[in-house]
Structure formats: structure tokens, C-alpha cells
């Protein structure tokens, strides 16, 4: 079932055909544990104080979680409970799994937000004129290759991890443990700048498991109950390569296997390597941190342009300076898939979107405690989030 050792890399593709790979990780991956804890802390503050200013980083290793960062808030938050509840939900509830919410040590090193930042960003300002919390550049991407306007590679990689979590929680595959990684390689055809998925070339799944399961049993279950339940049959063929549990053994996982840190899965969180990334992570940050809010807004713009039929594929870049409300620049790249010029599309964006942080927070309702849900399986391509509801454009 597993492919050859060399990975069967195919260099004989036709003109206009290429392969692209994206990966995702499950809830129990150590970096994702940290993302979820950071966003659980953010949500806990926003539930009591929608104006809380939060920048919360998390580190985890065997038997230990460290919270560090800067928070200014009226909320009274029990950090021990927030951390332990999050780990329990993820599924690390027994030391036999390498991590246990009941016995892990929780260290807290949180301070107030710097007054230098506060005075230039939000103090004595109308909400609409709140300044960006830092400088930076952010990207939004959309493509018509899927209904979600997301790359098929990352959509499937997320769904494979989510399916394993469902099978674990339901008890259908009781040998599964929370840490997992997936990777999907799709063969694409170029179509005048747009991309069309043709077939799946390779699927990789590595998932933590208990001791009393054989490798063959795991591989069979992953193919029959995970892949076939998630991946449309039209993309699979006799040449699709499967690397299922390629290490052969993955009993030690989660924070015991690797240290975790918030913000180390920024490509998993966004477009799986498609488009571009400005480098800023999302989790643990309130809306004044444009790393997060402006990336959500840029995705909203990109998806709205594609759904309006103005282009088939688009990359939107925005940039900011600390304390300045208006974006410094907005750029549109359509890969040649639009009947309009990029200047005309920029006019459409200016007429329909206000990308000041204080307006983004209102339009996308970013003071609500919705963030822990975003912290696994991707921030984009999921209809429950406001930035995934395309705006009806006037043009």
C-alpha cells in the first residue's frame, strides 16, 4: 500500500501540467495545541471584555505549558482552567498518551500591553480610527478550483485530519491519538492563469497511535475509513501513491515528541503554500493586530472578487504602519484571469471595502469570542466565519 522509498517523484509531466503539495496538522500536534490554547485565552478575555488587548503566546513540552505575552483587559480569567480545558478537549487526558491535562504544569508569564503601543494605537481614538497595532504586510488568496475558493490541496489535507479526530472521538478507531499530520499532492492543469485539479498524485498520513495496533491494520483503516470518506473518488486512480504511517511507528507524539510554540504553522493556517504569506501568525491576537484582522479582510476581498466573477484566481496584498489606520498600500494580482485590469479591480476594492482595522472589526464582527474554532483545520474556507461570506460588490 505504501509507495516506494524514493517517493515516486514524477518528472515526466506534460506542458501546462504541474504538481503542488500542501500539508495540515491535527489538534494534538504540539504547535497546534499552542495555537488553540492561545486562542482559548483570547476568547476567555473577549467573553468578558470585548475590548481586551491580547497578545498571548504558548509553549508546550512534556508535562508543561507556558503562557507568555501582553494582555490589557478588564476580564478575570482563570488561566489554569482555560489551559487544562483546552488540552482535555484536544484529547490528552492520560499520561499513557504522553500528556495529561490533569497533571501538566501551567506557568503564566503575562504582562500588560506596552503603554507606548496603547497610546499610538487605540487610546483617545474613535473606534473607526484605531491604528494598526504594528507594521506589516498581509495577503489574501482565492481560487475558483473549489466551492470554498480554496486550493484543493489544503482543503483535503485539513479534512483528512478532521476525519481522524471524528473517528477518534466517536470510538470507531480507538487506537488513534490526537497528534497527526497529513500531506496532499495534486496534479494540476493550467488554464490561462487559473488552475484545475486533475488528480491526486500522493497522500501522506502520519498519526499517533496506541501500542496494540499493527501497522497493516492502521494502513487499511486510514485508506478505507479516512481517505475514502474524505477524498472524492474522481481524484483517485490506480497510480495514486499512499504513504500511510511511513515511519512505521508513532506512539510518542504531541508535546512529548516535540516542543510546541504558537504561530509555527502559518502556512497550514492559510493557503498551504499557495498565494503568499507576510510572515505574521494569527493565534492569540486581538483585532488590533493586523497580522490577523487584515489577513482575514484580505481573504474576504479576494473571495468576494472571485465569487463576483471578476477573476478566477487572485492574490491581495495590504500593508500597514503602527498607529496608522489607513493601509499604506493595497495591491491586486489576478494571474491573468480577469477581463478587468488590476487598476480597475483596485477601484472596485476601494469602492466596496474599508480596510482600516477599526472598520474591519465592525464588518467582520471580530470582537466575538470565535477564535478557538479557527485555531485548527485552517482559518479560511470554512463557511461559519464572517470573512468567508463574500460581499456583494458594487462595480
Swiss-Prot record:
InterPro entries (UniProt xref): ADOMET_SYNTHASE_CS, S-AdoMet_synt_C, S-AdoMet_synt_central, S-AdoMet_synt_N, S-AdoMet_synthetase, S-AdoMet_synthetase_sfam
Tissue specificity annotation: Expressed in liver.
Region of interest (Flexible loop), ranges: 113-125
Enzyme Commission number(s) of this protein: 2.5.1.6
UniProt cross-references to PROSITE patterns, sorted A to Z: ADOMET_SYNTHASE_1, ADOMET_SYNTHASE_2
Superkingdom classification of source: Eukaryota
One CC-aspect GO term: cytosol
Cofactor: Mg(2+); K(+)
Residues noted as binding ATP in the record, renumbered to the chain: 29, 179-181, 247-250, 258, 264-265, 281, 285, 289
Catalytic reaction equation(s): L-methionine + ATP + H2O = S-adenosyl-L-methionine + phosphate + diphosphate
GO biological process: methionine catabolic process; one-carbon metabolic process; protein homotetramerization; S-adenosylmethionine biosynthetic process
Molecular function GO terms recorded: ATP binding; identical protein binding; metal ion binding; methionine adenosyltransferase activity
Top-level enzyme category: transferase
Modifications the protein undergoes after translation, according to the UniProt entry: S-nitrosylation of Cys-120 inactivates the enzyme.
Disulfide bonds: 34-60
Positions bearing S-nitrosocysteine: 120
Positions bound to K(+): 57
Residue numbers binding Mg(2+): 23
Pathway(s) it belongs to: Amino-acid biosynthesis; S-adenosyl-L-methionine biosynthesis; S-adenosyl-L-methionine from L-methionine: step 1/1
Cofactor binding note of this UniProt entry: Binds 2 magnesium ions per subunit. The magnesium ions interact primarily with the substrate. Binds 1 potassium ion per subunit. The potassium ion interacts primarily with the substrate.
Disease: Methionine adenosyltransferase deficiency: An inborn error of metabolism resulting in isolated hypermethioninemia. Most patients have no clinical abnormalities, although some neurologic symptoms may be present in rare cases with severe loss of methionine adenosyltransferase activity.
UniProt-listed PANTHER family: S-ADENOSYLMETHIONINE SYNTHETASE
Task of the protein: Catalyzes the formation of S-adenosylmethionine from methionine and ATP. The reaction comprises two steps that are both catalyzed by the same enzyme: formation of S-adenosylmethionine (AdoMet) and triphosphate, and subsequent hydrolysis of the triphosphate.
Quaternary state and interactors: Homotetramer (MAT-I); dimer of dimers. Homodimer (MAT-III).
Protein name stated in the entry: S-adenosylmethionine synthase isoform type-1
Amino acid at each position: 500500500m505504501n509507495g516506494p522509498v524514493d517517493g515516486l517523484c514524477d518528472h515526466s509531466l506534460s506542458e501546462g501540467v504541474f504538481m503542488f503539495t500542501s500539508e495540515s496538522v491535527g489538534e494534538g500536534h504540539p504547535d497546534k495545541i499552542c495555537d488553540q490554547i492561545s486562542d482559548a485565552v483570547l476568547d476567555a478575555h473577549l467573553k468578558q471584555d470585548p475590548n481586551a488587548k491580547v497578545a498571548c503566546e504558548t509553549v508546550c513540552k512534556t508535562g508543561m505549558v507556558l503562557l507568555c505575552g501582553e494582555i490589557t483587559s478588564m476580564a478575570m480569567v482563570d488561566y489554569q482552567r482555560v489551559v487544562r480545558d483546552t488540552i482535555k478537549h484536544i484529547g490528552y487526558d492520560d499520561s499513557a498518551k504522553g500528556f495529561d491535562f490533569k497533571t501538566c504544569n501551567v506557568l503564566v508569564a503575562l504582562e500588560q500591553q506596552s503603554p507606548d503601543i496603547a497610546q499610538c494605537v487605540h487610546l483617545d481614538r474613535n473606534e473607526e480610527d484605531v491604528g494598526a497595532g504594528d507594521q506589516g504586510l498581509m495577503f489574501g488568496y482565492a481560487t475558483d478550483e473549489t466551492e470554498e475558493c480554496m486550493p484543493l490541496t489544503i482543503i483535503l489535507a485539513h479534512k483528512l485530519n478532521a476525519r481522524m479526530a471524528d473517528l477518534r472521538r466517536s470510538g470507531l478507531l480507538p487506537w488513534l491519538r490526537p497528534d497527526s499530520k497529513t500531506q496532499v499532492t495534486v496534479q494540476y492543469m493550467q488554464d490561462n492563469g487559473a488552475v484545475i485539479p486533475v488528480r491526486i498524485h500522493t497522500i501522506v498520513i502520519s498519526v499517533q497511535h496506541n501500542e496494540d495496533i499493527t501497522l497493516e491494520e492502521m494502513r487499511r483503516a486510514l485508506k478505507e475509513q479516512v481517505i475514502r470518506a474524505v477524498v472524492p473518488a474522481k481524484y483517485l486512480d490506480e497510480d495514486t501513491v499512499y504513504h500511510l504511517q511511513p515511519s512505521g511507528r508513532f506512539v510518542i507524539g504531541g508535546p512529548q515528541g516535540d516542543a510546541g510554540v504558537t504561530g509555527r504553522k502559518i502556512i497550514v493556517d492559510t493557503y498551504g503554500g499557495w498565494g503568499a504569506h507576510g510572515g505574521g501568525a494569527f493565534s492569540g491576537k486581538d483585532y488590533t493586530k493586523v497580522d490577523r484582522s487584515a489577513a482575514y479582510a484580505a481573504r474576504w476581498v479576494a473571495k468576494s472578487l472571485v465569487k463576483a466573477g471578476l477573476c478566477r484566481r487572485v492574490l491581495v496584498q495590504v500593508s500597514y504602519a503602527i498607529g496608522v489606520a489607513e493601509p499604506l498600500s493595497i495591491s491586486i494580482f489576478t494571474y491573468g484571469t480577469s477581463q478587468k485590469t488590476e487598476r480597475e479591480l483596485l477601484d472596485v476594492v476601494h469602492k466596496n471595502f474599508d480596510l482600516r482595522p477599526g472598520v474591519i472589526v465592525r464588518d467582520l464582527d471580530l470582537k466575538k469570542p470565535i477564535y478557538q474554532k479557527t485555531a485548527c483545520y485552517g482559518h479560511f474556507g470554512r463557511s461559519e466565519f464572517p470573512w468567508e461570506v463574500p460581499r456583494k460588490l458594487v462595480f
